[in-house]
């Protein structure tokens, strides 16, 4: 029999080179008799690809997938990624360097321990398979791996990407002042010259628009940009909030 285990890979390929017969996963069963030569939970019949005589080597590391415990070299073992195709792009996760298709590679999203990939929002879906890793309502594809506030946490994992004290889930992707910077990354969302960190989410005039998005926070007819943060009458209330 030229294919003793019937996995579609000829014994001549699976036996390996030299006098020693290959047993990749060290389970005591030689590869040519082992339906899962690398013991990653994905059968050789799947990993070999369309031509068993020349099995696939997806990451071009010289180790064919059926013997490679990390076929796409993203740092996450095939045994963890499996054959699921999270982003339905036709490439199973164990071969996909961006399993969720959010534009952030699995090698980044996995975190420091590939055996226990990071799950930022603790929703049971690890970041490399989660389209909204921090659960703030803004997709990772939009937030990206940049770190707007320089706090060491990339936006896709940061609940307050601009560090203004107002959560991204509150600010959202609206661009109040039309400066091409969405509010969740804008330190002055309404462009009135008073930072969001100062204005906060209070709605001083009760008009339904929080101060950080309100050009006239106290509703006195004078814009916040004119009134500013000075306290003309010294009563402890800045002019932009003082009637």
Pin down the residues of each PLM region:
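Extracellular calcium-associated, cysteine-rich motifs in secreted modular proteins
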Residues: 1-243
């Amino acid at each position: 029999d030229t294919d003793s285990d019937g996995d579609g890979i000829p014994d001549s390929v699976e036996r390996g080179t030299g006098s020693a017969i290959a047993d990749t996963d060290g389970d005591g069963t030689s590869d040519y008799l082992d339906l899962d030569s690398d013991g990653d939970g994905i059968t050789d019949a799947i990993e070999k690809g369309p031509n068993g005589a020349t099995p696939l080597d997806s990451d071009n590391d010289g180790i064919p997938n059926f013997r490679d415990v990390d076929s796409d070299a993203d740092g996450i073992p095939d045994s963890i990624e499996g054959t699921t195709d999270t982003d339905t792009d036709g490439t199973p996760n164990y071969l996909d360097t961006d399993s969720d298709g959010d534009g952030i590679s699995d090698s980044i999203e996995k975190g420091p321990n590939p055996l226990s990939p990071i799950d930022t929002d603790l929703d049971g879906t690890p970041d490399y398979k989660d389209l909204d890793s921090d659960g703030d309502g803004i997709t990772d594809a939009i937030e990206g791996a940049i770190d707007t506030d320089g706090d060491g946490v990339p936006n896709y994992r940061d609940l307050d990407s601009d560090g203004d004290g107002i959560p991204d889930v509150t600010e959202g992707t609206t661009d109040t002042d039309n400066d091409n910077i969405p509010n969740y990354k804008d330190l002055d969302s309404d462009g009135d010259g008073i930072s969001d960190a100062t204005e906060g989410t209070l709605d001083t005039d009760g008009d339904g628009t929080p101060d950080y998005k309100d050009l006239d926070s106290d509703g006195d007819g004078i814009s916040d940009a004119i009134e500013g943060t000075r306290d003309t009458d010294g009563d402890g209330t800045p002019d932009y909030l003082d009637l």
